[in-house]
């Protein structure tokens, strides 16, 4: 029996939580926010270069950082995925959506940690909304990265590679070591 998208996302989230703790220990959310901002920038760059390979890689990396952020925040990515939505009426316009999202991620992460302008809970809710929008965007872009592609199919392919990396044993090149087997 095939697993649903939500079941598979939950499974990857559990696996990623264990992998992240093993490789990096307990991390802070702002580090994942920085990683997510970096990867969204790579999505925009891949789009502008019209590079399907780079788009595929960056979408998968966005997913990995989102999983890690969700694990730290205590959120379930499948729930956010099922409630994914555009941020505004122009949500599918690329690459223009990236800069406002990156700014909003930085804003809500910073203000939430400072507990100002609405407090930590307000900014956490805003971040959840941003994640739902990012998931909407990544799902839409996945079909551009690979014919018939979905966010889940790209995340699974990326996770298959990333999960083999041991950053404790190979802190300078775990990606290369894992790829060369």
Please provide the spans of the model-predicted regions.
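Flexible "arm" and connector segments at domain edges
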Residues: 1-181
């Amino acid at each position: 029996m095939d697993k649903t998208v939500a079941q598979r996302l939950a499974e990857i989230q559990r696996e990623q939580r264990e992998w992240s703790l093993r490789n990096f220990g307990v991390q802070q959310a702002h580090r994942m926010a920085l990683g997510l901002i970096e990867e969204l920038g790579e999505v925009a760059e891949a789009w502008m270069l019209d590079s399907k390979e780079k788009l595929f890689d960056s979408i998968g990396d966005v997913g990995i950082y989102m999983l890690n952020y969700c694990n730290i925040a205590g959120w379930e990515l499948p729930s956010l995925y099922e409630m994914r939505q555009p941020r505004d009426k122009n949500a599918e316009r690329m690459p223009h959506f990236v800069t406002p999202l990156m700014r909003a991620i930085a804003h809500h992460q910073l203000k939430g940690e400072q507990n100002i302008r609405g407090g930590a809970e307000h900014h956490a809710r805003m971040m959840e909304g941003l994640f739902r929008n990012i998931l909407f965007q990544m799902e839409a872009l996945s079909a551009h990265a690979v014919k018939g592609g979905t966010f889940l199919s790209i995340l699974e392919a990326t996770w298959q590679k990333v999960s083999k990396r041991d950053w404790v044993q190979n802190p300078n090149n775990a990606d290369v070591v894992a790829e060369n087997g």
